[in-house]
UniProtKB/Swiss-Prot annotation:
It comes from the Bacteria. It comes from Treponema denticola (strain ATCC 35405 / DSM 14222 / CIP 103919 / JCM 8153 / KCTC 15104). The active site is at R188. This is Flavin-dependent thymidylate synthase. GO terms for biological process: dTMP biosynthetic process; dTTP biosynthetic process; methylation. CDD domains: ThyX (cd20175). Residues 11-222 form the ThyX domain.
Length: 266
């Protein structure tokens, strides 16, 4: 606890505090019939049962508080998860630091040809990487210089800040229960999520494992590395087991085959 885990070029995640562990989950689940903690194996089986069957309230008994430093564009995706409590540094009260996210060269890629909100997997050539990085840094320096000039003229901080870029780093305290944290992690560790927020989610999951290893193991088995099948897809599986054609066609068949091949939700 209190250790900073580096994320991106200047960001971090730090576990400030937590309430409850795996033991709290099993104790709250068993309270209805008065039985306390049993063996680790029995506790693991109970936690696995609860997660598989979506009995969520015992997981809500465990609460984490994180201190996070992250670029504003990542924060704006993060804040879509409204089942948490947070306090963020204010640009109205504080002078924001000249700290901006600059992607590593290997992460600079062209727009995806088949995904309107994503990038291609391959990095652009080295010369273009250098050009993009130089351009980003120059723009960031120029904008921050303008911000500083406005502050020097005693312009209100709440106005001086408005041109600062989405790459500016912000900080917040973020508190969330384990059930809703698992929902956040399931979405933000997924391959469809933007790489930068995925980096934060993966570090957060590693921290979570140190507090609730049994719950995280079940989450990894059923949610992170599992997929859901529709009624039609289940029927297709039955057909394949029986040696028949799947019965699916077109996009439905493509999605079904991709699920089986990749082991992830599509």
């Amino acid at each position: 606890m209190d250790k900073e885990f580096k994320v991106l070029d200047k960001g971090f995640i730090r576990l400030v505090d937590y309430m409850g562990t795996d033991a709290r989950i099993v104790q709250s689940a068993r309270v209805s019939y008065g039985e306390g903690t049993k063996t680790v194996r029995e506790d693991a089986a109970l936690i696995d049962y609860l997660l598989r069957n979506k009995h969520t309230s015992p997981f809500e008994q465990v609460v984490f508080t994180f201190h996070v430093k992250l670029p504003i564009f990542v924060a704006r995706q993060w804040i879509r998860h409204r089942t948490a409590r947070l306090n963020e540094i204010s640009g109205r009260y504080s002078i924001l630091k000249a700290e901006f996210y600059v992607p590593a060269g290997k992460d600079i890629a062209l727009q995806s040809s088949d995904n309107k909100q994503g990038r291609m997997n391959e990095a652009v050539p080295q010369d273009l990487q250098n050009e993009v990085i130089t351009s980003l840094q120059k723009q960031q320096e120029e904008i921050y210089a303008g911000y500083s000039k406005l502050l020097d003229k005693n312009i209100a901080r709440e106005l001086a800040r408005i041109n600062l870029p989405l790459s500016t780093y912000t900080e917040w305290y973020w508190q969330i229960d384990l059930h809703n944290l698992f929902h956040f992690l399931r979405l933000r560790m997924d391959a469809h999520a933007q790489k930068e927020i995925r980096d934060y989610a993966e570090v957060m999951f590693e921290i979570c494992k140190t507090v609730t290893p049994l719950a995280c193991a079940s989450f990894e088995r059923h949610e992170k590395n599992g997929v859901n099948f529709s009624a039609e897809e289940l029927e297709a599986i039955r057909n394949l087991i029986a040696g028949k054609d799947s019965g699916l066609k077109g996009k439905e068949l493509e999605r079904f085959n991709e699920k089986l091949k990749s082991g992830r939700q599509v």
